[in-house]
Amino acid sequence: MAELSQLLEFLHHGNTQIRQLACDHLVGHSSDPTVFKKPQLVPVQDLKLLVRDYPPIAKNALTILINISHDSEIFENLAADDAFVETLLKKITDPKEQTADEIAMLLSNLAKSDHMEKLINLERALPAKTVSTSPYALDQLLDCFVKGANGTLNKHANFDYLAYFLADLSKHKVGRDYFLSRRDYDVVVPISKLTVFTEHKSHVRRRGVASTIKNVAFEVDKHPLLLSDDTETIDGVPGVNILPYILLPLAGSEEFSEEESANMLPDLQLLPPDKARDSDNDILVTHLETLLLLTTTKEGRDKLRKVQVYPLIRETHMQVADEGVREACDRLVQVLMRDEEEAPKIEELDEDEKIEEIF
């Protein structure tokens, strides 16, 4: 224990090599947050400062903070520290930052705090033009996520964990409004930037994006925007054309009758023989629940019937041997196949059937 206390003292040592050695050793103790809480969270304060240190030290400091941030006291200390959050924002929006992915992970943890809601409308300094031309923090992070997939913005990062960060912010009404409103700087509705990632190779990215799409679907008045084709405009804004991006992860290589296939969305017709549905059953359930939310209005139900969603869900039910997926399929099919006068409303579902925002 004395050795551990000494290591904690070394976190603010003047010698770089000693700080690095201390961080290296303390990563192995980060499964126990209590180690870093005494006295008065001083080690946590030291770690926050080390995030600005040389990359090897900063990476270890961030790894420790990621691991201990599930502790409620440490979690609140980090999320409520505006100066520290600004440090994270400054670094993650630097296209040369070597610890950008670790920062994305930490932000995804901190996004569960209501303190982080302030980032939705927070203005800050502009980053490099290659990153974003918006003065708003959330725009900048979204641009990192979109442009940085596969290391195309920062060779050290893919920003995948920002998917969880975005999903958490979409739990808030102000967050959903953000994702569904056209931004001035690029004249794009943010949710339309995310849809292309529903079939991305990164499981983290697919899962977070699916959750974000589901959460914004709670805004029933925006369903026309979500369901409209991108060649249509709703209140002067191009439609998001959300359906193909929800349905494709649910689609496998099954063949449909000529009549069924002819009425499906173009993206769902003539899929390759090696087409595989998403392998994560939780993601499948998320997409199925999004579709159920989109049946809240008669217009939504009519749209899903028109584009032959039922045959696709039928095959998903048959091919996926998972109780959660099959239950979600059943709930959706009941709505799609029911006579209109019997059609239920989402808000009238039994308590144990209610769909909730996730993350």
Q: What residue spans do the PLM features occupy?
A:
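Alpha-solenoid HEAT/Armadillo-like helical repeat scaffolds in large eukaryotic proteins
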Residues: 6-12, 46-53, 87-92, 144-150, ...
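Acidic, serine/threonine-rich intrinsically disordered low-complexity regions
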Residues: 342-359
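Alpha-helical solenoid repeat architecture
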Residues: 9-11, 15, 19-33, 46-49, ...
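Alpha-solenoid ARM/HEAT helical repeat scaffolds used for protein-protein interactions
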Residues: 31-38, 71-77, 114-128, 150-153, ...
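C-terminal interaction modules of eukaryotic adaptor/scaffold proteins
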Residues: 301-345
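Short inter-helical turns and helix N-cap capping residues of alpha-solenoid HEAT/ARM repeat scaffolds
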Residues: 14-15, 53-55, 95-96, 154-155, ...
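Acidic, Ser/Thr- and Gly/Pro-rich intrinsically disordered linkers and low-complexity segments
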Residues: 136-155, 250-282, 325
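Core helices of alpha-solenoid repeat scaffolds
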Residues: 1-5, 37-45, 78-86, 123-126, ...
